Amino acid sequence: AEPGGFISAFVHSPVTGTVKSIAPRQDLAGTWMTHIEITVADEEVWAEGIDTTKDIVTKLPEDNAFIIDRIKSNGVVGLGGATFPTHVKLCPPPGKKADCLILNGAECEPYLTSDNRIMIERSREIVIGAALMKKVLGGCPAVIGIEENKPEAIAAMTEAVTSLAASSSDYSGIEVQVLKKKYPQGGEKQLIAAVMG
């Protein structure tokens, strides 16, 4: 589904199939929303233009507009609850610039571990994503804030930052910052205060 304005995002199906219906339905909270029902195909087929290779590309594209377009067309959004489109965050208003890019690894909700696991298992991809966003924002420093109760994630992310920085200057200016375990430090304003002081 295509976005309905600048502050909206493409929605892609997680399965191969055919759209059966687009209709208002209640979600789990009882709110009426537009739902897209898909009849799942027997065979998985990827859309044209989707890179399905398992290789991790570490060389950053030169063209910032290309990076933003790929982020937008692939429907990349934040996972903080509002699913805010990432391409919007990477386009500050004219005359404004980012002082620092902060990646939120401060998963402070009790019993949640998805951020922790992805930092352990996909640390290189996260650092590559940070470098892409840092480049689009004009090369500002990037900080990955992780609470001190996640030693495996801290180690994995630090190793990824160090090894990628040694391989290319594209990855300089990215650091892991260990944060005190504090609720609700994962909130936007609390995280900015913790990282920036």
Label each PLM-derived region with a short phrase.
Residues 120-136:
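Histidine-anchored nucleotide/phosphate-binding helix
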Residues 4-6, 11-21:
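Generic structural motif
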Residues 21, 26-79, 84, 95, ...:
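Acidic low-complexity segments
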Residues 46, 78, 101-115:
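Gly-rich Lys/Arg/Thr-decorated short loops/hinges at beta-loop-alpha junctions or inter-strand turns
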Residues 31, 49-52, 82, 88-90, ...:
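Short acidic, glycine/serine/threonine-rich loops at helix termini
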Residues 143-197:
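Hydrophobic alpha-helical positions that pack around
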Residues 3, 56, 140-150:
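Conserved short loop/turn motifs at secondary-structure junctions
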Residues 1-8, 34-38:
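Short hydrophobic beta/alpha edge segments that flank linear recognition/processing sites
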